[in-house]
Amino acid sequence: DLKAVPRASLASERWLREMGDVVARFCRDLAATPEGNALVGIQVASGVYGEWHYWGFTDHEVDAGSAMTAAFRRWLRGRYGSDGALRAAWGDPAATLASAEVPDLAARRETRDGSFRDPATEQRVVDYYRCQHETVANAILHFCRIVKESWPRPLVTGTFYGYFFSCFGRDQAG
């Protein structure tokens, strides 16, 4: 199955809110059962294999839509604070915080040394991957927090995440 299937962006505020409501309701309902009383922990899962790898990370654009573009711009604003600082970091006199775009697949795949990137020439891609991975981590924290707040007693939460940088040879996996 190599066809790209539309999936929610992990940066989507709507997805985080709506799925958060579903997770909270699930937790409340499960906690009210005998099985729920026996639980000591819940694994929060999403993405490919339930391990927070981005949907379609093989040969497809990964999270390059409007939600991620907006998140990337907010992230850049927090990191650089001004167009001048962004231009200096990216070596691009036309770069602006308001118009920055997610690097396309070709730019993200091009590298001079395997998984290593040279910030002097590839800072735009470095920034995108850092934003992307922080977005995943923030989504994980969001859902773990909801589970803990929705459960009537202390509960362990966790997830499968945090593989080596070059897992699958695809930095964009998540």
Regions found by a protein language model. Give the residues of each.
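Polysaccharide-binding and catalytic clefts of secreted carbohydrate-active enzymes
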Residues: 1-174
